């Protein structure tokens, strides 16, 4: 699938689910460890630099960030997990909002999980995968920073990840290689996003933000 002609814009950021946009239409949530390249991946897929904040401090993104494709379709940047050094009360509110979002958000169509290809399947990655399996939420894993490995090593990592995901027994789990630096894997990613968001497939010569 070619990159669809969508224009992605920032919508809002929340700490509590009650402040989220109306639970209508469809959403895809991006999740991952704080240094897995999540924000960079969103910017690459949107073809808009700086759309999602890229911080040099892992865990700086503490809120759930919503981006609008159109009135009925959204991308959601979930807080990165793993390194966040924030006050306890804020951290508790953050975790509660994240859990509530995954549990109750009716418009959620799938989770796009970003994992560093060199350090995949951390403990928190496993928690997210198990949560999706338990809730029957579609999951697509993007092994980021694939440019850091040789092609052979990257393909082996993908095969190992595919085998590991198969162990969860979900037909809606998939995996790919991705590199924001090389912009590789974008069409494969949009194939998944387009299916989940029910994007039209015609007239797809333009790129997002064009």
Swiss-Prot record:
Protein family membership: Belongs to the TRAFAC class TrmE-Era-EngA-EngB-Septin-like GTPase superfamily. EngB GTPase family.
Name of the protein this chain belongs to: Probable GTP-binding protein EngB
PANTHER family to which the protein is assigned, alphabetical: ENGB-TYPE G DOMAIN-CONTAINING PROTEIN, MSS1/TRME-RELATED GTP-BINDING PROTEIN
InterPro entries: G_ENGB_dom, GTP-bd, GTP-bd_ribosome_bio_YsxC, P-loop_NTPase
Task performed by this protein: Necessary for normal cell division and for the maintenance of normal septation.
Residue numbers binding Mg(2+): 39, 61
Keywords: Cell cycle, Cell division, GTP-binding, Magnesium, Metal-binding, Nucleotide-binding, Septation
Residue stretches making up the EngB-type G domain: 24-199
Organism: Methylococcus capsulatus (strain ATCC 33009 / NCIMB 11132 / Bath)
Any single GO BP term: division septum assembly
